[in-house]
């Protein structure tokens, strides 16, 4: 875990309210890190509705396979997360580790192994010794608390420099419900599902199918629109749980994602997902600047997003941002290599509110002083208009610094 907190970290953290129906505990198992917690147990007092989206990597981790197999039941009683070891590319040993963890968690909580969900993050390719923490899950269940969100977020960190938490409230049929979420991620971040690891819990009463629809729709403009280094993790897991405790306040169960009562909840959920996703980018390994890339005028929205990601993932664009150089030529390069339709002579490019290029050449009113002032900011916007259609998209990334190389060059040591 990095020592210095990212300069882009939040200046303050929200007060995370206790959420009815869920309790958490952490433990220090010494999986990779010393003198810190590295295991999280999240317990649902009653079966919670569950939804999930996972990595599209063709080399998924053993916990991802395990979660996918259990997701169809629609019910969760516990989640076990460890940091320091991804339990990915670990063969039969990896599967055995998930089975031991699930068996131990089920015994600790008093449920079936089909109601257990697992996630691991850390080094890929090294066997996970689940016996280091499987034996303490019973004790963790006993001491689990409802008001433990910050500590839960800390336990799942790897190269993160700060815990990522967020909370929102919404209304369903006149009943106020709460949504809390935690995330981890700083490297191996690219949009192809969700984020690295993220767990969101609400006390709303929503059936699993509706919950899944809400989550699947929410990841597109949020977690699927952020990138740090274009590398999609083998372990990406985003799960949404609904404890149903709001039924005690009179909330009538939601059975369909088309239910009009979900309007406020959907907006709050999407806002929380975006908040967590942007916190991940702000903690990008070695990051010193946050970059928002917006593409307009593409053939369609899908084309706009592909172009935006081509820009956001370009090492040359990202290093130019790190060097505070408004090098629009690199943006042009990234547009051209995206594989989408573009007309060089129609392109227009802005850094912040300063137009630097138009009609395929440098803006005749270009101001070096104005552009330099923009590039010195911590939060930078880049806008590109393709000039061909109505497609639009926005993605977020960070700069690429020497610290990123140092962090990843030393990661296994």
From Swiss-Prot:
Binding annotation for substrate: 158, 184, 195, 285, 408, 413
A GO BP entry: L-arginine biosynthetic process
EC nos: 2.3.1.35, 2.3.1.1
One Pfam family recorded for the sequence: ArgJ
Cleavage, annotated site positions: 194-195
Subcellular localization(s) per the UniProt record: Cytoplasm
Enzyme class: transferase
Biochemical pathway: Amino-acid biosynthesis; L-arginine biosynthesis; L-ornithine and N-acetyl-L-glutamate from L-glutamate and N(2)-acetyl-L-ornithine (cyclic): step 1/1; Amino-acid biosynthesis; L-arginine biosynthesis; N(2)-acetyl-L-ornithine from L-glutamate: step 1/4
Superkingdom per UniProt: Bacteria
Subunit structure: Heterotetramer of two alpha and two beta chains.
Protein name: Arginine biosynthesis bifunctional protein ArgJ
Natural source organism: Agrobacterium fabrum (strain C58 / ATCC 33970)
Gene name as annotated: argJ
């Amino acid at each position: 875990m990095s020592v210095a907190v990212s300069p882009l970290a939040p200046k303050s953290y929200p007060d995370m309210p206790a959420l009815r129906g869920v309790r958490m505990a952490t433990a220090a198992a010494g999986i990779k890190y010393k003198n810190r917690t590295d295991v999280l147990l999240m317990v649902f007092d009653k079966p919670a509705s569950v939804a999930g989206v996972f990595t599209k990597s063709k080399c998924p981790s053993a916990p991802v396979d395990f979660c996918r197999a259990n997701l169809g039941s629609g019910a969760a009683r516990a989640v076990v997360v460890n940091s320091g070891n991804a339990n990915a590319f670990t063969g039969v040993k990896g599967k055995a580790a998930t089975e031991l963890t699930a068996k131990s968690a089920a015994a600790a909580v008093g449920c079936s192994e089909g109601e257990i969900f697992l996630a691991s993050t850390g080094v890929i390719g090294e066997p996970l010794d689940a016996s280091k923490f499987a034996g303490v899950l019973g004790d963790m269940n006993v001491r689990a608390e409802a008001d433990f969100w910050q500590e839960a977020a800390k336990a799942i960190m790897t190269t993160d420099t700060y815990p990522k938490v967020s909370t929102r409230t919404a209304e369903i049929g006149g009943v106020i419900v709460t949504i809390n979420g935690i995330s981890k991620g700083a490297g191996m971040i690219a949009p192809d599902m969700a984020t690295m690891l993220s767990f969101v819990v609400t006390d709303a009463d929503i059936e699993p199918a509706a919950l899944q629809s809400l989550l699947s729709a929410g990841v597109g403009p949020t977690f699927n629109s952020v990138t740090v280094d274009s590398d999609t993790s083998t372990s990406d897991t985003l799960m949404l749980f609904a404890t149903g405790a709001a039924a005690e306040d009179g909330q009538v169960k939601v059975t369909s994602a088309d239910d009009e009562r979900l309007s406020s909840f959907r907006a709050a959920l999407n806002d929380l997902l975006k908040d967590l996703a942007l916190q991940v980018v702000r903690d990008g390994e070695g990051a010193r600047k946050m970059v928002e890339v917006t593409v307009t005028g593409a053939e369609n929205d899908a084309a706009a997003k592909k172009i935006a990601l081509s820009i956001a993932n370009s090492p040359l664009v990202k290093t130019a941002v790190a060097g505070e150089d408004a090098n629009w030529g690199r943006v042009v390069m990234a547009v051209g290599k995206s594989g989408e339709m573009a007309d060089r002579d129609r392109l227009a490019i802005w850094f912040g509110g300063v137009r630097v290029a138009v009609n395929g050449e440098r803006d005749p009113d270009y101001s070096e002083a104005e552009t330099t002032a923009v590039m010195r900011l911590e939060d930078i916007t880049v806008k590109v208009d393709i000039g061909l259609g109505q497609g639009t998209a926005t993605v977020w990334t960070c700069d690429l610094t020497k610290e990123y190389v140092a962090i990843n060059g030393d990661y296994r040591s």
